[in-house]
Amino acid sequence: MVSLCIKDNNTKIQDFLMKKIGESNIPDIYYSKHIFKLYENVIIHYKGKDFQKFYKFLSNLLSDAIINYYEPTIVKRLILKDYFYFDALDRNSIYNEYNILHHNSKKYINKDILDYIENHKSIVLNGFVNFRLSNYKNSLEPLVESAVSKFVLDKEYLEFVSLLRGYVDSKIPEPIKIHLIYSNKESILLDENYNMLEFEDFNSEYLSDISFSQNDYALNTLIGKLPESIYIHLISPKDEYIETLELIFGKRI
C-alpha cells in the first residue's frame, strides 16, 4: 500500500481534491479529510498494484489544483510587480487577456509533482508552489508579456478608432454615396454610379517610409471624402477591418 497526505488550508482546494478523487475510476483508492495541527489534510491510500497509474492520477490532480487555485494569484502578482505603472483597471484587463491566451502550463508542473510524490508521503501544497515550481512560474512570465502587448495594442487601436470617429462626427458629410467591395481582405471603392474610385494618398512626408495596405488607403479615402452613405458589399466574411469601419463611420454605413 502507498499513501499520500496533501496539506493545504484552502477549503476550495480541499473540496476540489475530494470531489475529483471520488469521481476517479481507479479501484482500491481510499481517502479521507482530517485536521492535524496547522493544516487540513486530504489523506489518500492506494492498495492496488498499478502504482504508475496512481501517481500519474495524483500528479494530474495536483497540477489541476495548482492551475485553478494558485495560478491566478501568481499571475496577478507578476503583473503587479512588473507592470505596477498600470492602474488597477488596466491590470485587470491584462489578466483577462492572459486568460484568453492558449497555453499549457500543466506540462511544467506534472513532472516536478510526479518526482516529488513518488519519493515523499506528504506534500504541503502552498510550500511546494512557492519553492519547487520555478520552471512553471518562469513559464508564465512570457505569457504575461504577451498579454500586456495585446492589451497595449488593443488600447492604442481603440484610441485610434475614437480619434477618427470624433473627426468624422465633427464634419458635415458630403452628399455622395460610396460602395466598398470587400474580398480576400482587400477593398475596392466605387462611386454611386459604380465607377471605380482611385485611392487618396497619405500626404505627409513623415509617413513616406511606412508601407500601407490597400485597406489603409481605402480608409484614408473614405475619411477624405466623408460620404453621407457607405454601402459595404461583402464577398468575404466580415472581419476586424469591416468592424473598424463600422465603428468609425457609424450610421453612415
Tell what function each PLM region has:
Residues 1-216:
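Conserved mixed alpha/beta catalytic, RNA-binding, or beta-rich assembly cores of soluble enzyme
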Residues 193-253:
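C-terminal structured domains
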